[in-house]
């Protein structure tokens, strides 16, 4: 199995919705999570780049899909954070529709990393994301972020509780703890991404370029 060099990951483009994304080919792994789940920090830690994904001071403001290329035909996709209280209701609904559309229609999307604050896991929208992914036969890795905020015993208890809870989804859902601050769980994240990028079947370009 090829170990990819995530430090070579580079920004490709931002898109407001699925229609503005590049052609639906290769393999994409998306990162999703609530606005304060530490998604940007996880991407920066994974790639060992301090500012690959911008950490926003105003959560919920950047409603764009950001694409990064790890290697030819292998992309990481940073989906906008969801569930931020101060975003207008209409914008929330619009974004949830766009998220659902991306998860259901994007053929090259083959893995989903759902990030949740270990202290507040499995909120309604987190469960919705996992459900969408499982319904679309997309493998899921749940990362319980900010794991350094809990003592070892509490951390294990949360991990076991979430692992138990996701069994109800009846899908390919793995759960691990993660800390950007302590670099904990980074190896497991890289291993999972390597597995997905190496073993999933890339989507080929069709005749009409669709």
Curated annotation (Swiss-Prot):
<dbReference type="GO" id="GO:0000917">
    <property type="term" value="P:division septum assembly"/>
</dbReference>
<keyword id="KW-0717">Septation</keyword>
<protein>
    <recommendedName>
        <fullName>Probable GTP-binding protein EngB</fullName>
    </recommendedName>
</protein>
<dbReference type="GO" id="GO:0005829">
    <property type="term" value="C:cytosol"/>
</dbReference>
<dbReference type="Pfam" id="PF01926">
    <property type="entry name" value="MMR_HSR1"/>
</dbReference>
<feature type="binding site">
    <location>
        <begin position="78"/>
        <end position="81"/>
    </location>
    <ligand>
        <name>GTP</name>
    </ligand>
</feature>
<dbReference type="InterPro" id="IPR027417">
    <property type="entry name" value="P-loop_NTPase"/>
</dbReference>
<keyword id="KW-0547">Nucleotide-binding</keyword>
<feature type="binding site">
    <location>
        <position position="40"/>
    </location>
    <ligand>
        <name>Mg(2+)</name>
    </ligand>
</feature>
<keyword id="KW-0131">Cell cycle</keyword>
<dbReference type="InterPro" id="IPR006073">
    <property type="entry name" value="GTP-bd"/>
</dbReference>
<feature type="binding site">
    <location>
        <position position="62"/>
    </location>
    <ligand>
        <name>Mg(2+)</name>
    </ligand>
</feature>
<feature type="binding site">
    <location>
        <begin position="178"/>
        <end position="180"/>
    </location>
    <ligand>
        <name>GTP</name>
    </ligand>
</feature>
<comment type="function">
    <text>Necessary for normal cell division and for the maintenance of normal septation.</text>
</comment>
<keyword id="KW-0342">GTP-binding</keyword>
<dbReference type="GO" id="GO:0005525">
    <property type="term" value="F:GTP binding"/>
</dbReference>
<comment type="similarity">
    <text>Belongs to the TRAFAC class TrmE-Era-EngA-EngB-Septin-like GTPase superfamily. EngB GTPase family.</text>
</comment>
<keyword id="KW-0460">Magnesium</keyword>
<keyword id="KW-0132">Cell division</keyword>
<dbReference type="InterPro" id="IPR030393">
    <property type="entry name" value="G_ENGB_dom"/>
</dbReference>
<dbReference type="GO" id="GO:0046872">
    <property type="term" value="F:metal ion binding"/>
</dbReference>
<feature type="domain" description="EngB-type G">
    <location>
        <begin position="25"/>
        <end position="199"/>
    </location>
</feature>
<keyword id="KW-0479">Metal-binding</keyword>
<feature type="binding site">
    <location>
        <begin position="33"/>
        <end position="40"/>
    </location>
    <ligand>
        <name>GTP</name>
    </ligand>
</feature>
<dbReference type="InterPro" id="IPR019987">
    <property type="entry name" value="GTP-bd_ribosome_bio_YsxC"/>
</dbReference>
<feature type="binding site">
    <location>
        <begin position="145"/>
        <end position="148"/>
    </location>
    <ligand>
        <name>GTP</name>
    </ligand>
</feature>
<feature type="binding site">
    <location>
        <begin position="60"/>
        <end position="64"/>
    </location>
    <ligand>
        <name>GTP</name>
    </ligand>
</feature>
